[in-house]
């Protein structure tokens, strides 16, 4: 299976969905999983991306193998058009006011003094997902230079007034501004709900993955469950330009597998 080098777009409301269980996700609240690319019960095949980029629209799994044997996945990039970790960069700060910049891929609105992120289907006009800041988030993550750490501080929780000031900027006014620094990137997520994972292998054997770049994964990480003999070589987990987060949670996660799992010459940045 060859993807001639190009950018390929996959939309949730034009993709296949099936009921299945994924470990470390909420398969009771969200049993119906959506897949951009789903390959089932195939043997002795190669999927060559030829340097292509798979662009995912919606909160779904980018790529999945189920019940496959002796499969090679090579030379492609996975990128989400609107990542479901929501990043806010501090660009201006005063005693009672902070201006945040939001990446261009994430749409948002301010209504009733609440900041809500969303991604809208170009076909139906309905939202693939919505997330109201701190509505489903126990804690946030701060990226400060090379430091990454968790915090209970929030851009919106103590805000007295939230105002959209531009296509990609929002201003929050406070009684006392949270102790963020200019340049900090605060990342929030819907961490009460893991409804899917980014890439998914189930009941597969002898799978080889090489020269794959992952810019982001929704819901969880790259999950392999009940598999045998997995090889990952020259993988790169790195956020797309303008972002700091490369996965909702975890990067490679292996559960209930046997044989070997080999990870070689790879780069992990999260």
Q: Model-predicted segments: where are they?
A:
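Long amphipathic alpha-helical scaffold regions
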Residues: 227-262
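All-beta strand scaffolds that present successive hydrophobic residues in beta-strands
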Residues: 3, 46-49, 70-75, 182-183, ...
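Generic short beta-strand segments
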Residues: 4-17, 103, 236
């Amino acid at each position: 299976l060859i993807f001639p080098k190009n950018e390929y777009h996959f939309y949730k409301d034009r993709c296949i969905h099936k009921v299945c269980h994924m470990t470390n996700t909420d398969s009771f609240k969200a049993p119906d999983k959506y897949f951009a690319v789903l390959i089932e019960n195939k043997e002795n095949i190669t999927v060559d991306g030829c340097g292509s980029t798979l662009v995912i629209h919606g909160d779904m799994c980018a790529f999945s193998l189920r019940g496959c044997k002796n499969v090679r996945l090579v030379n492609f990039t996975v990128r989400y058009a609107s990542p479901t970790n929501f990043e806010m960069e501090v660009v201006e700060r005063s005693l009672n006011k902070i201006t945040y910049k939001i990446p261009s891929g994430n749409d948002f609105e301010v209504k009733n003094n609440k900041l809500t992120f969303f991604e809208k289907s170009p076909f139906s006009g309905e939202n693939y997902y919505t997330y109201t800041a701190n509505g489903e988030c126990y804690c946030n993550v701060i990226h400060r230079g090379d430091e990454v750490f968790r915090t209970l501080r929030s851009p919106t929780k103590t805000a007295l007034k939230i105002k959209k000031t531009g296509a990609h900027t929002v201003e929050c006014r406070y009684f006392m501004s949270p102790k963020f620094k200019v340049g900090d990137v605060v990342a929030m997520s819907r961490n009460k709900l893991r409804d899917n994972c980014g890439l998914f292998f189930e009941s597969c054997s002898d799978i080889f993955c090489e020269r794959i770049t992952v810019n982001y994964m929704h819901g969880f990480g790259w999950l392999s469950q009940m598999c045998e003999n997995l090889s990952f070589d020259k993988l790169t987990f790195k956020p797309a330009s303008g972002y700091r987060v490369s996965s909702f949670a975890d990067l490679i996660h292996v559960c209930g597998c046997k044989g070997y799992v080999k990870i070689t010459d790879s780069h992990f940045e999260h």
